[in-house]
């Protein structure tokens, strides 16, 4: 995608701002220090790499920088830490049990064609969850190139497309990604190439069951399917699935108070 002209950036930003508002708004997001999600995930893509799934974990994504923790991971009494250029597995008392620097560079060799280890999955899951929870809020950063890309008809609905080029220093699936917003601005589909799997791994990622968790709108279900070159998805297999069970948010030294009338599913963790 060519560099962002001012008119294109402005048009793309207008759509991005609608998405941001539909997912809770910039004012809420800018208050937050972290988002905690309890979720389970699995799928054919992981089984292809000889990984034991499903995995159920508490995932904490810090706002600002790329820092994600998964616990328990890869087993009880341990946690995984993703920090972009490094992943590590720690014991309950914080001892580093294993570490990999520059984990993205490890993909592409013969071993990775056959199987992934716990650090590989930690890198993939870490950047993926950072992407899913921080998008679309990060698009206010001018380092993200934004271009409106027309509309898309699917399932009787019309979705608006936003083509995004991520900054080169951000760990994510691929630099070029496309998001599809419904009339309310909620992200319903997200296209990318899952590069750690390979340049062939074109994905169509669907989000459904959006719920309001203390003001932050998060989809409860995510399903990832192969994407044909023309853009249509293949219904099978389900490469990745994610089921969100609970979401909590924290701001500063205090957790955000639950508002009356919110769903009882919402919980706030001790900051």
Language-model segment annotations:
Residues 156-256:
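Gly/Pro-enriched, hydrophobic low-complexity segments
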Residues 62-67, 106-115, 213-214, 249-254:
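Short, surface-exposed linear segments at secondary-structure transitions and domain or protein termini
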Residues 140-148, 236-271:
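Intrinsically disordered terminal and processing segments
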Residues 1-22, 263, 267-271:
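Amphipathic/hydrophobic helical signal segments and adjacent flexible N-terminal regions
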Residues 115, 220-221, 258-262:
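Short, surface-exposed secondary-structure junctions/capping segments
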Residues 8-14, 91-170, 197-198:
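Flexible, processing/modification-adjacent segments and terminal tails
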Residues 7, 21, 26-100, 148:
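N-terminal mature ectodomain segment of secretory-pathway/periplasmic proteins
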Residues 65, 80-87, 103-108, 133, ...:
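A general structural signal for short secondary-structure boundary/capping elements
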């Amino acid at each position: 995608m060519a560099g962002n002209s001012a008119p294109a950036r402005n048009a793309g930003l207008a759509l991005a701002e609608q998405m941001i508002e539909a997912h809770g708004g910039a004012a809420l997001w800018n208050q937050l220090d972290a988002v905690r999600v309890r979720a389970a995930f699995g799928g054919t893509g992981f089984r292809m790499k000889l990984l034991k799934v499903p995995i159920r974990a508490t995932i904490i994504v810090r706002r600002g920088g790329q820092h994600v923790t998964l616990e328990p991971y890869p087993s009880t009494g341990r946690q995984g830490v993703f920090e972009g250029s490094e992943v590590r597995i720690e014991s309950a008392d914080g001892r580093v049990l294993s570490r990999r620097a520059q984990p993205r560079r490890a993909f592409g060799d013969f071993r990775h064609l056959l199987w992934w280890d716990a650090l590989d999955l930690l890198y993939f899951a870490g950047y993926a969850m950072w992407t899913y929870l921080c998008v679309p809020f990060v698009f206010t950063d001018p380092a993200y190139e934004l271009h409106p890309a027309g509309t898309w008809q699917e399932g009787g609905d019309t979705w608006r497309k936003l083509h995004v080029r991520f900054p080169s220093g951000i760990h994510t699936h691929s630099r070029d990604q496309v998001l599809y917003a419904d009339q309310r601005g909620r992200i319903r589909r997200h296209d990318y190439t899952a590069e750690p799997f390979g340049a062939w791994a074109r994905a169509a990622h669907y989000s459904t069951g959006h719920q309001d968790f203390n003001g932050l709108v998060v989809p409860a279900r995510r399903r990832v399917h192969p994407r044909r070159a023309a853009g249509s998805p293949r219904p099978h297999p389900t490469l990745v699935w994610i089921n969100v069970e609970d979401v909590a948010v924290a701001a500063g030294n205090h957790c955000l108070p639950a508002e009356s009338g919110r769903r009882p599913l919402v919980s706030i963790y001790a900051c």
